[in-house]
Each structure stands twice: as structure tokens, then as C-alpha cells.
């Protein structure tokens, strides 16, 4: 009984902490990823254009920078500008899940947190990227994360719509997606 109460308390905490995040019943969707993915072409700076809201990204001018480390892993540096003008950042590492699907990565930001999926569903490497992540919770429901990224702070609306259509066609709800403010943003390190 105590274990059940602890589990229910933890779930209630998850729901309370995840306001705005996309919780759904059932297991995670399994969308196809970018074919013939080339991580070397993916490296560099990406600007967040839209996302399914997350509890861990609340600022504006959100940027991600990917670089190859000596150990073969990918260094991930995510940065955002807070309302008070300070830069919030987190650094992590991404690694391929398996070599047959190099667009399926796992990213880890802290030694005490589990790795999270980071799947590149679509990219042309020079303009846009569509990233999806999903975490299944006790086999009852899942939480979705999705990001539309661009090499520049803006992306044509027709490109954004096309990327959202990829998500929708794979049963990933885009109704909660929000635009990331990239107006008058500095280039973060």
C-alpha cells in the first residue's frame, strides 16, 4: 500500500511539474528517422523555431550547438536567454543508439539522469531539422517532445508546416507546439 501511495504521489508530481507538456495514453509512437543520416553534416549551431513545451526550456533565443568530441561522442550545448538577460545553459553528450540507424541518438545531460531519445526525423542539414523524443512512463502513458530547428533564427512557414505534417502523420500531436522567440537575439557561445 505504501508503494502504491508513493507511486501515485510521484505521478501527481510529474503531472504538476509538466504543465504544458504532452502526455498521452499508451506507448510512444515509432516514427521513421532520417535515412542516411550524416552526423558530421548535422554538427554546428541550430536555432529553435518551435517546440512542444517543456519544463526545462522557458527562455527565448534558444540555441543548440553540436560538436564532435575526441571520444567520438557528440557534445550538446543548449542555451537560452532568460527574462532577466542572463544566459542559462546545459551541456550534455549524445551517442548513437545503433549504427544501423545513426539518426537515433540518446542524449544525457547529467550522470544521475537517464539518457533520453533524440531522434532526427528529417533534416536537409543546411536549413531545417525535425527532432523527436518520447519517454514511456510505467507502460501506461508517454510524454512527447518535439523541436523544429533551423540554421537561422527563422524558417519559412511552409517549411514549418511541412515538418509539422511529418509529426502529425506519425500520430504525434502538434496542437501544443509553441513558437520560440528569436527576435533580436544575440549569438550565444
From Swiss-Prot:
Keyword Secreted among UniProt keywords: yes
GO cellular component: cytoplasm; cytosolic ribosome; dendrite; endoplasmic reticulum; extracellular exosome; extracellular region; extracellular space; neuronal cell body
Keyword Ubl conjugation annotated: no
Swiss-Prot/TrEMBL keywords: Disulfide bond, Glycoprotein, Lipid-binding, Pyrrolidone carboxylic acid, Secreted, Signal, Transport
GO biological process, one term: negative regulation of protein import into nucleus
Quaternary assembly: Homodimer. In plasma, also exists as a disulfide-linked heterodimer with APOA2.
Protein name (database record): Apolipoprotein D
Amino acid at each position: 500500500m505504501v508503494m502504491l501511495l508513493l507511486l501515485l504521489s510521484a505521478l501527481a508530481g510529474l503531472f504538476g511539474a509538466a504543465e504544458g507538456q504532452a502526455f498521452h495514453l499508451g506507448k510512444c509512437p515509432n516514427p521513421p528517422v532520417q535515412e542516411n543520416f550524416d552526423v558530421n553534416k548535422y554538427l554546428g549551431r541550430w536555432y529553435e523555431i518551435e517546440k512542444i513545451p517543456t519544463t526545462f526550456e522557458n527562455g527565448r533565443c534558444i540555441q543548440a550547438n553540436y560538436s564532435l568530441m575526441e571520444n567520438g561522442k557528440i557534445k550538446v550545448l543548449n542555451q537560452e536567454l532568460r527574462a532577466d538577460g542572463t544566459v542559462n545553459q546545459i551541456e550534455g553528450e549524445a551517442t548513437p543508439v545503433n549504427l544501423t540507424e545513426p539518426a537515433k541518438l540518446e542524449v544525457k545531460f547529467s550522470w544521475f539522469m537517464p539518457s533520453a531519445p533524440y531522434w532526427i526525423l528529417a533534416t536537409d542539414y543546411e536549413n531545417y531539422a525535425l527532432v523527436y523524443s518520447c519517454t514511456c512512463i510505467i507502460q501506461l502513458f508517454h510524454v512527447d517532445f518535439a523541436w523544429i530547428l533551423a540554421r537561422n533564427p527563422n524558417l519559412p512557414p511552409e517549411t514549418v508546416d511541412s515538418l509539422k505534417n511529418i509529426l502529425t502523420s506519425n500520430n504525434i500531436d502538434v496542437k501544443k507546439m509553441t513558437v520560440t522567440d528569436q527576435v533580436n537575439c544575440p549569438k550565444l557561445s
